[in-house]
Regions:
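C-terminal scaffold of the Radical SAM
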Residues: 3-5, 26-48, 52-330
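Short amphipathic alpha-helical interaction segments
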Residues: 330-344
Length: 376
């Protein structure tokens, strides 16, 4: 009998504004069938007969684009049949612009115990430049309200290497983030995705981005500054105070299975990676017909081993060679020994006892290093 996943990702695709860099599955909330969407999403969730979860993550889009009453329906529907004694972490993503007191009260009265705020930058001019509608003052107001409501597990997302951004602006952002006195931060360099405003501008030569060496300096500065402030750099883009690592995201990097619920959501169950219908109307119809999925991919053993390496090497702790061999019944040294020795020689990887992991230099070249673990 297959072991059931103990994590679930729930996708709320609605936004009150569309950011210029975002390619996630999302729609402008106005005139959307939000109540019907929530009803269908909860129907899909119920179809898996989920009773025990260790982590539950509600992302988007923007979950807090929902009204307070809609949030209440969602949270109640998701947790009604769950054994809350084993639910370690329930995260919800929020935008500083739309998290008001009523919504915070709903979160407080639910099983939510972790809030992730999409700050992106503290610079009002830059916020406008990247298509965000909130202001710096909204960030402080929301953090204060969340702390007052008793939330101590708060995370923020920041983006660096933004158009026209200087090293001084990055330093200012990091200093303001540290001053918030919160236990977790995710910092991502800007990645240009197709079908975004920024990619269109880039193609027209109208997007002045920092040079690659400046981006590398920004990354090095961020790591050093946050480590000095007591944060552990536990994954390429993530930093936490001790004990406040994102358990849900660690699940992804441990290559564990999880349910993906909602329009455009991806999941990994019984060795099958799947993706749900993206457009809202298509998703609603698919749920009514009893199957929200549009694609399914049965991973081969080779693909599973490759993913174990790609994902695991994102973590500071890297990959356990013993666990790898127990999981796949293959010799780690036979598959990857030569590659690891070569990367160690280049200063991109190190071997600590049972574990292989990337060096700081390796982390910056993460994708290039990961490509070496594709099996021929």
């Amino acid at each position: 009998m297959q072991k059931k996943p103990t994590s679930a990702y729930v996708h709320i695709p609605f936004c009150t504004q569309i950011c210029y860099y975002c390619d996630f599955s999302k729609v402008f909330i106005k005139n959307q069938p939000v109540n019907s969407y929530l009803e269908h999403l909860l129907e899909e969730f119920a179809s898996y007969d989920i009773q025990k979860l260790r982590t539950l993550y509600i992302g988007g889009g923007t979950p807090t684009a929902l009204s307070a009453s809609q949030l209440e329906v969602l949270l109640d529907g998701l947790t009604r049949n769950l054994d809350l004694s084993v639910l370690e972490e329930l995260t919800i993503e929020a935008n500083p612009g739309d998290l008001d007191e009523d919504k915070i009260a709903v979160l407080k009265n639910s099983a939510v115990n972790r809030v992730s705020l999409g700050v992106q930058t503290f610079d009002d001019k830059m916020l406008k430049k990247i298509g965000r509608s909130h202001l710096e003052k909204d960030i402080y107001e929301n953090i204060d309200r969340l702390k007052l409501a008793g939330f101590d597990n708060i995370s923020i997302d920041l983006i660096y290497a933004l158009p026209g951004q200087t090293m001084e602006q990055v330093k200012d952002n990091v200093a303001k983030a540290i001053a918030l006195d919160i236990p977790h931060m995710s910092l991502y360099s800007l990645i240009l995705e197709n079908h975004t405003v920024f990619m269109n501008r880039m193609r027209r030569g109208k997007l002045p981005l920092p040079k690659e060496e400046v981006e590398a300096e920004m990354f090095e500065y961020i790591i050093a500054a946050l480590e000095r402030a007591g944060f552990e750099h536990y994954e390429i883009s993530n930093f936490s105070k001790p004990g406040f690592e994102s358990r849900h995201n660690l699940m992804y990097w441990d290559n564990a299975e999880y349910y993906g619920i909602g329009a455009g959501a991806s999941g990994y169950v019984n060795g099958v990676r799947y993706k749900n219908h993206g457009p809202i109307r298509h998703y609603l119809k698919a749920v009514e017909e009893g199957n929200a999925r549009i694609t399914e991919e049965h991973l081969t053993l080779r693909e599973q081993m490759e993913e174990e390496m790609f994902l695991g090497l994102r973590k500071k702790s890297g990959v356990s060679m013993t666990r790898f061999e127990e999981k796949f019944e293959r010799s780690f040294d036979g598959l990857y020994g030569e590659i690891v020795r070569d990367l160690v020689q280049q200063g991109l990887m190190q071997v600590d006892g049972d574990r292989v992991r990337m060096t700081k230099r390796g982390l910056f070249l993460g994708d290039t290093v990961a490509e070496r673990f594709i099996l021929e």
